[in-house]
């Protein structure tokens, strides 16, 4: 109970500091406050305002433009003289090392890991399913 009273009193003093009330009315229809807990060099300037009816607090914080001199260009890697391995080079070396798997095809476990599927999807259908498949299905109307 006392904590709630202290909380209400502290918030009431903050409201009075931000938006002074004189004779039951707000001194300014749209009183602004530039109070900010952010550091001065932060890329945002916060402004608080109270609407004319006194029920809504409006917070406006536009981002500050950064001068061009303070920016850096995005480094683009040189693809011709790049010594780092690219994704394609890594895949090529893995596939070149596994000539056995290329001749008979990748194994079912590898296929399920590459395509994020279950292992059952890569097994062939049996004779029971193949003989019941309609070879000449009827055409749609």
UniProtKB/Swiss-Prot annotation:
Interval spanned by the transit peptide: 1-31
Keyword Ribosomal protein applies: yes
Protein name per the record: Large ribosomal subunit protein mL42
Report the sequence similarity comment from the record: Belongs to the mitochondrion-specific ribosomal protein mL42 family.
Gene Ontology annotations for the cellular component aspect, listed alphabetically: mitochondrial large ribosomal subunit; mitochondrial small ribosomal subunit
Q: Which Pfam families match?
A: MRP-S32
Keywords associated with the record = Mitochondrion, Ribonucleoprotein, Ribosomal protein, Transit peptide
Q: Where in the cell is it found?
A: Mitochondrion
State the organism of origin.
Rattus norvegicus
Assembly and partners are described as: Component of the mitochondrial ribosome large subunit (39S) which comprises a 16S rRNA and about 50 distinct proteins. Component of the mitochondrial ribosome small subunit (28S) which comprises a 12S rRNA and about 30 distinct proteins.
């Amino acid at each position: 109970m006392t904590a709630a009273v202290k909380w209400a009193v502290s918030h009431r003093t903050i409201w009075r500091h931000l938006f002074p009330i004189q004779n039951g009315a707000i001194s300014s229809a749209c009183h602004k406050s530039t109070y900010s807990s952010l550091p001065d060099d932060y890329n945002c300037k916060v402004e608080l305002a109270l609407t004319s009816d006194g029920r809504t607090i409006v917070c406006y914080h536009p981002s500050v433009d950064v001068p061009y001199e303070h920016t850096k260009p995005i480094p683009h890697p040189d693809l011709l003289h790049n010594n780092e391995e690219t994704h394609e080079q890594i895949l090529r070396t893995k596939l070149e090392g596994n000539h056995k798997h290329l001749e008979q095809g990748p194994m079912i476990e590898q296929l399920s890991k590459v395509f994020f599927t279950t292992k059952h999807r890569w097994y062939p259908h049996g004779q029971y399913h193949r003989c019941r498949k309609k070879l000449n299905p009827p055409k749609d109307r």
